[in-house]
Amino acid sequence: MPKPIEWNEFDSGMGSKLDVSSSLNSSSSNMDRDRSESPKRHVNGSNSLKRGLHFDGEHTERDPHLGNGQKYTQQERRVYVGNLSYQVRWFELKEFMGQVGNVLNCEILNLPNGLSKGCAIIEYSTAEEARTAIKTLSNQKFMGRLVYIREDREQNARFGSSSVSPSASSNGKDSEPDRQLFVGNLPYNVRWQDLKDLFRQAGSVIRADIQMNQEGRSRGIGIVVMSSMKEAMHAIQMLHNTDFMGRTLEVRLDRFAHHKSKPYSTHGNGYTFPAEMQMTTSSTYLPMLGANTQVEDLVYHAYPHGPCSDCIYVGNLPWATSDRNLLDLFTDIGSVIRARIAYEPTGRSKGFGVVQFENENDAASSIEKLNGYRYGGRPLQLSYAHYATPLPAVPTVLSGLPSVAYTPPVMHIPTTNSPLTPQSFTNSFLGYLPISMPVANMPAIAPISVALPENNIEHSLEPS
């Protein structure tokens, strides 16, 4: 097996402008696929079922092998790539898959809410390159995950361009999400003008914003939109991990830029989750997602605005947010123990969740950085979690000490209806008297008299 290759970064040369393929109409395929069916779209007046799954980045390249009369790509030149990182971009994946051949199309499959499914379809220029990719790149480490690659099983698949944004197709410019950068660890006194001047070193800046809290103070994070994707990549390489006014900057692509334009709608009084949104989770992440009954109290008994702790309450979440989405959102902030979304008995999200960190510092940092952050078009409401009753503590076991069962003493008081005999009373009472020990020079103990008020019977108890 080839030596595993670790891919975490990409070349800035991938920022070149790409051609956009033309729209192609066809009937739907009934072949079995490992990904969900796409929604229906109206194309040229006909209601045909098209692949509504689109590029993460809303770009597609024209296949030079496709003539005007050929609507579908060739199956033997396509491969399916699974177990991808949810943060991977199409140009990063193309760079990785391009090691073994010329990549014509690279499509990351997304959910209706814009989140990645963790899988993609790649098309090479020849069938031999596709077979080489399966043999060479499968089980290789890419962005921290072992990807698996196999042949694409859909015969009449094609890379439609219906999902290409108008801005990308009409004027040839890169879509804004591919040009939007997240800037972290900014000094709190930095203004948006300072941020814009800083990024002008890498290219033309369209917009620069500093995110503020409810009191109007900087959160230490900002958003910068460059004029092109190439300049955005150049800004990352130039400014990431550099010192700016005494602080080391974090500069990366804004992974939630695509989510902000995705609407979350409800129908009637509840939200209906489509089948595509039932995301499966590997057992590796189950402990972090809190998939056990012991953490139910962590979520369903939580309220906002609690005292400082390692648990935070995340409110105003989009209805489609899953446990996995919540975990991915806070993983970069600190060490997450578990992240859970609260659900109604009907399966509908309650719109809030709880995230537990390893320490209070990570919880405080997450509130400072993400409170008010627009996620899925909604400003998040973060605060420490509050519990009406304390969470049950983890039981501790003292090693080396035997367990002793203690039974509290119970004395029966006689009544006139059920008199207690002197002998039975004596036996019951003496069972709880300490055993007398011989002590030198100890005076004799006088007899003990016990008076019963109801029948005035005295019982003399002689110590043993």
UniProtKB/Swiss-Prot annotation:
Compositionally biased region (Low complexity): 16-30, 161-170
User: In which organism is this protein found?
Assistant: Schizosaccharomyces pombe (strain 972 / ATCC 24843) (Fission yeast)
According to the UniProt entry, its GO molecular function terms are: mRNA binding
State the protein's name: Serine/arginine (SR)-type shuttling mRNA binding protein
**Lineage top rank: taxon:** Eukaryota
CDD domains reported for this sequence: RRM_SF
- PROSITE patterns annotated for this entry? RRM (PS50102)
Does the keyword Cytoplasm belong to this entry? Answer: yes
Described function: Binds to intron-containing transcripts and is involved in quality control for the export of spliced mRNAs from the nucleus. Binds to pre-mRNAs until splicing is completed or until faulty mRNAs are degraded.
- Output a single Gene Ontology CC term carried by this record: ribonucleoprotein complex
In residue numbers, the region (Disordered) covers 1-74, 158-179
Query: Repeat: is it a keyword of this entry?
Result: yes
Q: Where in the cell is it found?
A: Cytoplasm; Nucleus
Q: What GO biological process, any one, is recorded here?
A: poly(A)+ mRNA export from nucleus
Q: Where is the composition biased (Basic and acidic residues)?
A: 31-40, 53-65
In this chain the RRM domain maps to 77-154, 179-256, 310-387
Q: Which keywords does this Swiss-Prot/TrEMBL entry list?
A: Cytoplasm, Nucleus, Repeat, RNA-binding
Give one Pfam family, short name only: RRM_1
